[in-house]
Amino acid sequence: MSSLAVRDPAMDRSLRSVFVGNIPYEATEEQLKDIFSEVGSVVSFRLVYDRETGKPKGYGFCEYQDQETALSAMRNLNGREFSGRALRVDNAASEKNKEELKSLGPAAPIIDSPYGDPIDPEDAPESITRAVASLPPEQMFELMKQMKLCVQNSHQEARNMLLQNPQLAYALLQAQVVMRIMDPEIALKILHRKIHVTPLIPGKSQSVSVSGPGPGPGPGLCPGPNVLLNQQNPPAPQPQHLARRPVKDIPPLMQTPIQGGIPAPGPIPAAVPGAGPGSLTPGGAMQPQLGMPGVGPVPLERGQVQMSDPRAPIPRGPVTPGGLPPRGLLGDAPNDPRGGTLLSVTGEVEPRGYLGPPHQGPPMHHASGHDTRGPSSHEMRGGPLGDPRLLIGEPRGPMIDQRGLPMDGRGGRDSRAMETRAMETEVLETRVMERRGMETCAMETRGMEARGMDARGLEMRGPVPSSRGPMTGGIQGPGPINIGAGGPPQGPRQVPGISGVGNPGAGMQGTGIQGTGMQGAGIQGGGMQGAGIQGVSIQGGGIQGGGIQGASKQGGSQPSSFSPGQSQVTPQDQEKAALIMQVLQLTADQIAMLPPEQRQSILILKEQIQKSTGAS
């Protein structure tokens, strides 16, 4: 017995104590102590009470002075009847009574965890990572091999084991990343995906984010081969229960959030550079935007190719004093219910990109071609483009009628030029003109912005200076500004009214209305090749004297797809001719509803046509 006395005090106490069960609830410790004192001296007797209710649980512990007395109590008092119940006396150190014995205080034996010291759940991932990293490669490979065999032989048991021990599943997942069996990004997705697993054993399934199962994982988490003999790495079960666990060992960059950003719309390939005087809405309707800086790109109609000179200045003019964009010829005013977009045809172009005060020059039919090399005061503001099949040349010779007839742009013209096809003009936007006749979306042939061409380019009252060549009324600038086919400008002059000098199609095909402001062959202000506006261009003297020169194609110097004498009448020509006829057929009431500048321009236009008709 002396050998027992030198044992650990807690263990010795457990050997000297007995477990007493099936105690009546009304019994007191004093009554029980008296009963157990029959076999020997009782050091203490303690009943176990429920912590929540405070009621006795029906069992307790009796401590004797020595182990022999405790053994005697188990032999003699087991089955003793007390208050109608038979008391059960057993060894307090048995496995069944260990938990109850702990309530007695430090007398309970201290059992070391085979997994190491407990660890805070928040530090568990880092601890597991260190444990996995400390394993030699050979041992890690052997563990993974054994786990594979375990899954192959007993899949369900392996799954249950990993579900009940999430720290083990995490360690295996980490080992796969270390051994490069699994991509870190895939491991992260497995860890963070939300999976609700039905517990196989009630109360056993744990979420890693709450706490480590049982004893927390420690540096010695990954046991040797003897522990993982029947374990293997399951590809699917591992992530379960790891969904909400904080992962500190995997770099944050692996956590790649899936961001479904809305792709920004790509740039419209054929966009007017900068803030043009006008732009087309996606539906093709012209929106008056003269003088408004920052106008976005303009979509084209029917796949027309719009070419522009990147070096051209971007006119950014201030808003007009009234705060509203300058009004166009037909329905550009915000208060016009008809909503047309034909341009205003009066006023000079200011370099800053908005319409200035009207030019008070003589009417167009009185203007004579001046041999000046300066820019015309009636520059067009620049519509986006015209027909891509046509190119503008520099009209240095006599204008050729579409049917091959020579014509004098300043006054005389063949009477046949007044035919319907001779009256077509790029001034009329053929794609936006409404049947009311008021919305002719001026000067746009399949994509030309009506407002893009400063209507003051069509100023019929101002003089039309003719530049360096017998252009017969066409307004030539000092040098050819070749906008065709994306070519760079060939002249020093940049048309301030065009949103980006070289807006292709800036030339309004004046195949018929060869107006003073309309630079010949699509702002033939020096040969600006309107990339498709050639041929049928508004020759700036075309309305002078002779008025509307019918369907004139720039002959001679015209490097376009039209040969100098070509007399074909295309469907586009017929459409444009019909459009200009609609403009000319506007009633007096319709014209009266227009702003003063536009109304005056329409009247001047009709007057020129009447005079030219009478002359023919």
Curated annotation (Swiss-Prot):
CDD domains reported in the protein's UniProt record = RRM_CSTF2_CSTF2T
Note whether Ribosomal protein occurs among the keywords: no
Q: Which residues carry this modification: Phosphothreonine?
A: T320
- Region named Disordered: 203-241, 262-418, 542-573
Q: Which Pfam families match?
A: CSTF2_hinge, CSTF_C, RRM_1
Identify residues that carry Phosphoserine. S563
Q: Which GO terms describe its biological process?
A: mRNA 3'-end processing
Q: Where in the cell is it found?
A: Nucleus
| PROSITE patterns for this protein | RRM
9 X 5 AA tandem repeats of G-[AT]-G-[MI]-Q, as annotated region: 505-549
GO cellular component terms given for this protein: intracellular membrane-bounded organelle; mRNA cleavage and polyadenylation specificity factor complex; nucleoplasm
Give start-end positions of Basic and acidic residues composition bias.
368-381
Role noted for this protein:
May play a significant role in AAUAAA-independent mRNA polyadenylation in germ cells. Directly involved in the binding to pre-mRNAs.
Protein name as catalogued: Cleavage stimulation factor subunit 2 tau variant
Task: Give the originating organism.
Answer: Homo sapiens
UniProt gene name: CSTF2T
